């Protein structure tokens, strides 16, 4: 069916008539699920913003007001809180799937995806601070102070973000505005990510590169994406039965600038990076290692190699990389004491070693098998 409207024609080409391989599995649902969760987070977050007050004296109490006084406010708050965890679960599955199938060969898709990941981490951190609880307040103090390692301008940048000489109500307003606006920038980059992907196709080893052996995206894969409904049902049930199991008990205590928690721990989806940061006693080197834990994957897109040799070795190393990431996440929430202070540097070295080994295999496979 021909559509004359240019906007509808664009949407039709992306969601209906897009030529798609017959062999894509359910692991290709992660992207569509991420899009659904992103929209879900924007909707629930907008509702919460109606009642939230970005003031250091009222922020914590307005969160309690939403929970206890606003009609169905507790549902929106619980779903928004757990929706962030659901988003990161599928985001990490999406990234690991990309490593598994060497998706970094699609340079624009890979680079835009990593940029989305960095922005989402910033977005989640700022949302975490908005509760203005004891743990989130001190997490804001620790993380923002890391910017002071930037040569020359570092202390000035920290003072500018804090709007003073410490994390205050002005910092809270700054984070609230960015937390409200950043999702729209993420949506824009997601659109670019989608366009780049659909203009080149997938990197699955089963992928068919001729349009003669493909099917339209709808209804074949629209129906397959309907399996996401099962995930949503599980998410709703778990959120209602265990609403705060993924949080910290300190998040129920109002922020006290005069007393820090015994053990500062970020949300679970930042723990692997936090473990790498703590593994290095030097502040500057720790921040560099923290950044490189993510920035390293940008280097994959700089290699001009479109072959897919050594795929079995690549998949084996990806599984080892996933295991090391999970162990680092566990170490990130452990106390700073033996044996964890020994294990964290060890698994940080393994993490980077596997990442650069994957990069090295990707670089050399073309030379070995050309």
Swiss-Prot record:
A ubiquinone binds at residue 198. Changing residue 257 to L: In strain: HK104. It is a multi-pass membrane protein. GO terms for biological process: mitochondrial electron transport, ubiquinol to cytochrome c; proton transmembrane transport. It comes from the Eukaryota. Its cofactor is heme b. Heme b b562 binds at residues 80, 179. Heme b b566 binds at residues 94, 193. GO terms for molecular function: electron transfer activity; metal ion binding; oxidoreductase activity. It holds the Pfam family Cytochrom_B_C. One of its GO terms (cellular component) is membrane. Binds 2 heme b groups non-covalently. PANTHER family: CYTOCHROME B (PTHR19271:SF16). Belongs to the cytochrome b family. Heme 1 (or BL or b562) is low-potential and absorbs at about 562 nm, and heme 2 (or BH or b566) is high-potential and absorbs at about 566 nm. This is Cytochrome b. It comes from Caenorhabditis briggsae. The lineage of its organism: Eukaryota, Metazoa, Ecdysozoa, Nematoda, Chromadorea. The gene is ctb-1.
């Amino acid at each position: 069916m021909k559509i004359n409207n240019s906007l509808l024609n664009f949407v039709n080409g992306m969601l209906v008539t897009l030529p798609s391989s017959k062999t894509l599995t359910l692991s290709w649902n992660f992207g569509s699920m991420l899009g659904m969760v992103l929209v879900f987070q924007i909707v629930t977050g907008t509702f919460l913003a109606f009642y939230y007050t970005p003031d250091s004296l009222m922020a914590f109490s307005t969160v309690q007001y939403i929970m206890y006084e606003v009609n169905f406010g507790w549902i929106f708050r619980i779903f928004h809180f757990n929706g962030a965890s659901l988003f990161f679960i599928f985001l990490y599955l999406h990234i690991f799937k990309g490593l598994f199938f060497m998706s970094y060969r699609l340079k624009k898709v890979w680079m835009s995806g990593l940029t989305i990941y960095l922005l989402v981490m910033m977005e989640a951190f700022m949302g975490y601070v908005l509760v203005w609880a004891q743990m989130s307040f001190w997490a804001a103090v620790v993380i923002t102070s890391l910017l002071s390692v930037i040569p020359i301008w570092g202390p000035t940048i920290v003072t500018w973000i804090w709007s003073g000489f410490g994390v205050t109500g002005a910092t809270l307003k700054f984070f609230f505005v960015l937390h409200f606006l950043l999702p729209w920038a993420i949506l824009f980059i997601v659109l670019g990510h989608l366009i780049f992907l659909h203009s080149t196709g997938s990197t699955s080893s089963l992928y068919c590169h001729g349009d003669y052996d493909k099917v339209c995206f709808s209804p074949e894969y629209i129906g397959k994406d309907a399996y996401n409904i099962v995930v949503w049902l599980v998410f709703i049930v778990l959120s209602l039965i265990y609403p705060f199991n993924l949080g910290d008990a300190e998040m129920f205590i109002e922020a006290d600038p005069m007393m820090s928690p015994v053990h500062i721990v970020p949300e679970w989806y930042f723990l692997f990076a936090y473990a790498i940061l703590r593994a290095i006693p030097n502040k500057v080197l720790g921040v560099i290692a923290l950044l490189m834990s993510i920035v390293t994957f940008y280097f994959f897109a700089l290699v001009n190699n479109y072959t897919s040799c050594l795929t079995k070795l690549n998949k084996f190393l990806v599984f080892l990389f996933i295991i090391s990431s999970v162990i680092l996440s566990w170490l990130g929430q452990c106390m700073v004491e033996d044996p964890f202070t020994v294990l964290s540097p060890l698994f940080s070295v393994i993490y980077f070693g596997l990442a650069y080994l994957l990069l090295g295999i990707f670089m050399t496979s073309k030379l070995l098998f050309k």
